[in-house]
Amino acid sequence: MPKKFSQRAEDLRRALALEAARIMAEHGIEDFLQAKRKAADRLGVNDVAVLPKNVEIEAALREHQRLFGRDSHDHTLKEQRRIALDTMRMLNEFQPRLVGSVLTGTATAYSDINLHLFADASESVAIKLLEIGVPHEFYERRVKMDAERSINYPALRFDANGRTVDATVFPIDGIRQSPYSPVDGRPMKRADAREVSDLVGVN
């Protein structure tokens, strides 16, 4: 009996991961917890013990993107990375790093472009944007730095060729420590302009 229950729970977990991935891909939801809750609600699941981990949802999202509209996804991802690269070059003095789904390849058509910038003060980034005529707004982003610490950092949101860019501003020495990824709890992958250039195949 326990073995049967375990298999049923595993099947349900898999179904929830697939549904959460579908919701993220088709409805532009990027928050894993929100996608899990919506998936559980749609499948009538109340047991939080069977909710999938974020890494399981990300794997299901990759599978969904491979099976449904792969050409469209690849085209959109390349466009997002090109815009990210142009923006990084524009903000080169702040040592920009691309992070998140546009870097890892799981971005949907609704995904924002997420950058990490490094400066003594976030105002210097704002001044740069004003100088080049880019409207923007300030907000705070809570970032998990390790297992015990979460810190609020200033961030700026602006448009770049029809895509939303979210740029979090870290202190200059913040380039040495990458925050934890919300997907797997490990240090987040970061890519500089050269690495992004390699991804899109441009010089």
What is each residue range found by the language model?
Residues 2-29, 36-109, 120-203:
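Catalytic core of pol beta-like nucleotidyltransferases
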